[in-house]
Amino acid sequence: MNTQLEVCIDNIESLHNAIAGGPTRIELCSSLALGGLTPSYGFMQQAAKHSTIPVYAMIRPRQGDFFYSEEEIELMRWDIEAAKQAGLNGVVLGVLTQDGNIHMPYATALCEFAQALGLGVTFHRAFDQCRDAEKALEEVISLGCERILTSGLAPSAPQGIDVLKALVEQAQGRIALMAGAGVNADNVGQIVEQTKVTEVHLSGKTTRPSHMTFIAEQSKMGAADVDDFSIPVTNTDAIANMVTALN
């Protein structure tokens, strides 16, 4: 498989399901329903212990935008160090200014810190909330990031094909472009062929029923429209089908 395939997961069951499908890298998160947040240190350790492929930890301290305070940046530094201590291979991060540009002072500090620890760095879909993709691409390249996860500044990668193609052409091999959001086995061939991206990203999510025998109806642990007894997990077949499509 010449095209790298990354799977994002947010629980240990999904780690095993994803690896069984045959991807080349794991993006380790919590709360994928919120776009992916930093996983716990325990989850990082378990992933490092059990994974047979590289694992990159999401470094995102909260949901919402990517304009962070100094305290949040310090928190992210600690989480990067935790990823290293846990034995992971890299981290996934992104930092913006209030006006939608890459926050170069903060991004430089975080990337240099991670790289000094020997960790690879992916710049995540904060890129898709930038005001100027061409400028942002050059800045992320200057940070020494290995890749950018992007939908081409669109709601989904299939909708961002033209921008993805332009970014690949602008990059000229200086950084990998990884297409993500709405990518599946049915459309990945077209996306790769038209854009020439070298990496793709998906969750391959499904749900399974709870193994509980007592289904509590009297309370909710979160939002009223979320079923506490329907567990989101990675679908091994969805990953395997993607691998087949890429081959």
Swiss-Prot record:
Pfam families: CutC (PF03932). Belongs to the CutC family. Keywords: Cytoplasm. One of its GO terms (cellular component) is cytoplasm. It comes from Vibrio campbellii (strain ATCC BAA-1116). This is PF03932 family protein CutC. Its main location: cytoplasm. InterPro entries: CutC-like, CutC-like_dom_sf. The keyword Cytoplasm applies. It is found in: Cytoplasm. GO terms for molecular function: copper ion binding.
